[in-house]
Amino acid sequence: MKVQLEDTGVNLNNIDSIRDYRNDILTNVRKYFSDTMSTEILSPVETYTAKTTTYDGGAASTYALNHALNYNPDYADFNGFGGDCTNFVSQCLYEGGGLPMHYGTPYTKTCWYYTTSTNRSSSWTGAEELYDYIFSNSSKINANISNWNSVSFGDIIQLTSGGEGYHSLIVSGIQYSSYGKSDLLVCAHTADRRHVSLASYYPGSNKRYIDITSSDL
């Protein structure tokens, strides 16, 4: 007796007919899930892209002006322990400029953070270490080596000797004359300076200029 599913046309006595029907079902199921995944599941999902935090140099310079002579009690004072200059500049980048901390192993320069005086990265408090971190492969801070003409509010200036940084300053203002840009005004700790002339207070020193732009955190 010939047995047949009326709504499918499958001949249950014919193995080829059954196999063809099964293959048709599998094909339709795959197509259904493929269409569903692409339209209902995959389309709302965004591919991961690194978050970028834009550096606010103006706010960093405002923080510098507010705390150059008035130390923030949330941070240890490293005067007498190698100096507080880079601790202060790091505060400006974070508290004022809005750059997120990059946590990691304490006392290393593969990260950039401060929790306590004994739980911090060396790049938070050391001039050369901060420079090394910023321009390392592990850095989350985006910056460029710049020059006197190009740096602006919130950028870093480091005094160097033998090619290594030993003192960090932050730009808090720019002076102009009738001929154009004439001087940079800076803030610093150790020694504490607020909005002073770079040319007058640090004449003849070798300097490097760091233009901070953003963070990838």
Question: Could you describe each region identified by the protein language model?
Answer:
Residues 68-69, 93-98, 158, 162, ...:
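Hydrophobic/aromatic-lined pockets within catalytic cores
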Residues 74-123:
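Extended boundary segments
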Residues 182-193, 198-217:
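Low-complexity, Gly/Ser/Thr/Pro-rich intrinsically disordered linker/tail segments
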